Amino acid sequence: MIGQTIVHLRLAFLVTTVALCNVCVAQSSATAQSAASPKQLLVIGEEKGYRHEAVSHAMATIERLGRETGLWSTTLRTDSEALTKKKLEYNAKNLNDFDAVLFFTGGDLEMDAQQKADFISSIHDDGKGFIGVHSAAITFVDWPAYGDMIGGYYDEHPWLTFDAPIIVEDPSFPGMQQFPHSFVLRDEIYQMRNYSRDKVRVLMRLNVSKLDMKNKNVHRTDGDFAVTWAKMYGKGRVYYTSLGHVDANWDKPELQQMITEAIKWTMRLSNADVTSRPLPRNEPFYPGCSTAR
């Protein structure tokens, strides 16, 4: 009887050991696969005209976030050469090698007509992701296809760098959960033209009840000052945020999490609803409401 019990215990131990080994092997394989095949992100920090001091810090932060999470590998460029599907010399990467492109740019980048066509096609037709940060909305302001893709263009920053009163309009979107419903962040927020919330999913907007609407540079009369949005462009996913002008903000965990989730979403590592929604007018933050504050 004792001998049979020992045999049964040994068998049970062996079965458990084998099961645990299988789990470990599976986990190791999954980890190795993840480490061996991160997504590829191209970050462009080229500016023509005004130079933003935060660009270098932002690029370094985005590279670090990808490396630390293991989710993406980052290629940093301060030129536009890689924005093409054409084979480049010296084994340089082109758009075909990336899952998403991030712009912290400004002005008319040095791209010929074929590069522009390749860039738009890579998002609209190939389904690659695009993330636009801050001055990406002052890029190619005379190129309608780019404006249609990103969702809007810069039209002054009436309040310059100020304590911006921000409302999180869609707390369910990845990267919004860490923010309170309303908060203040010192940054430079753009007023937008060629923008319509009918074409985007607004994630953050300014609280107009706390703005100086008598500022002579205020052009919008609808009270819709979007700060961050997401949208589809053909097959591609597009994300834009006006945040990022202030260098120190790139050290804030909340902003880093927002950018991480934005990149993940554009790379299809997460999903979210980007159906457009009307400007809320039934909450205490809307100036037309009797409880506005």
Region locations from a protein language model:
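Bacterial N-terminal signal peptides that target proteins for export
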Residues: 1-13
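Helical hinge/lid and interdomain linker segments adjacent to catalytic or ligand-binding clefts
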Residues: 34, 42-44, 49-132, 136-139
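Extracellular ligand-binding/catalytic regions of CAZymes and related secreted enzymes
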Residues: 34-38, 45, 53-56, 60-69, ...
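A glycine-rich, often tryptophan-bearing local segment used as a flexible ligand/cofactor-contacting loop or short
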Residues: 108-181
